[in-house]
Every structure is written in C-alpha cells, then in structure tokens.
Design a protein with these regions (language model features):
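Short coil-to-beta strand junction motifs in C2/discoidin
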Residues: 60-69
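Post-signal peptide N-terminal segment of mature Sec-exported envelope proteins
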Residues: 26-47
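Bacterial signal peptide processing site
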Residues: 18-21
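Edge beta-strands of jelly-roll/beta-sandwich modules across compartments, strongly enriched
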Residues: 126-137
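Short amphipathic, basic-aromatic surface patches that mediate peripheral association
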Residues: 50-61
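An anionic, turn-rich surface loop/hairpin at beta-sheet edges
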Residues: 83-111
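Noncatalytic modules at the cell exterior or secretory-pathway interfaces
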Residues: 41-50, 108-128
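C-terminal motif of bacterial Sec signal peptides marking the signal peptidase cleavage site
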Residues: 14-16
Length: 142
C-alpha cells in the first residue's frame, strides 16, 4: 500500500510540472526598451500585449491619447521586421496614475523558432509626462 501511495504521489508531481504558459517583462524608463520573447515551441502560437503606467495627477498628464512606437522584431538569425503601432494611453485610471494594457499581436507563429528580440522605441514627437516604462506580456497557446 505504501508503494502505491508513492507511485500516485510521483505521478501527481510529474503531471503538475509543466512549462509556464507565458512571461512578462516590465522595463523602466522612457525607452527604447529591449525585450526577449522565447518562441522555441514550434507547436504553439503566441499572443503579445503591451502595458504601461503613468504616474501623474490628471492636470499634469499630457492630453495624449496614444503613444506612437516603432516595434522592431529581430529573429534568432538576426533578420529584422519593423512596424509602427499606437499604444492607447487610457484604460484604467485613478487620481494619481493611469494604466494601459492592449493586445498587440494574437496567434503569432514565427517562421524561425527560438528566442526573438523585440526593440520598442517611442517616437520623439510625443512626450508622455509621468511615463514609468513599458511592459511586454507573452502568452503561449497550444
């Protein structure tokens, strides 16, 4: 009976161990921000979301609705892709801060599997007062 209990415990622990379904990175500062995205699983697709936070009272926040960003993807083989996206800056607010979170890309299946580098650069044309940094959330889906 003791052996059966040990086997059941071992199988339970074995099944409980799995790779994380995603990862998040938040980088402080005004940019550019460099993230790593592990896309080594060739059977999965990936969802990417950006999030940010501004700490400033409403009167001191710039009336900017969105932040233009250049997003550069660098493959494991050093090939690059680049695009301009606009991150909305108002979703959840309190008196002293506001947070934004937006789905950037859904169901990404890269041609080259491995660890990608994503460099995000804000445009100089927009100044966002109280910007704390930028975060990238990567969710793996099977």
């Amino acid at each position: 009976m003791k052996r059966a209990g040990t086997v059941i415990l071992f199988l339970t622990l074995l099944l409980a161990c799995s790779a994380p379904k995603g990862a998040e990175q938040f980088l402080k500062g005004k940019g550019p921000w460099t993230f790593s995205a592990d896309m080594t699983d060739s059977l999965s697709t990936y969802d990417f979301s950006f999030y940010t936070r501004r700490d400033a009272a409403p009167a001191k926040r710039a009336q900017v609705a969105e932040l233009p960003l250049t997003v550069q993807w660098i493959s494991p083989a050093a090939d690059t892709l680049s695009e301009i996206v606009y991150l909305p800056l108002s979703s959840r607010s309190t008196f002293y801060s506001s947070e934004s979170s937006v789905l950037y890309r859904e169901g990404v299946s890269p041609e080259a599997h491995g660890v990608w580098t994503i460099v995000v650069t804000p445009h100089d044309t927009v100044t966002v007062r109280g910007l704390r940094g930028l975060g990238l959330a990567v969710k793996r889906r099977k």
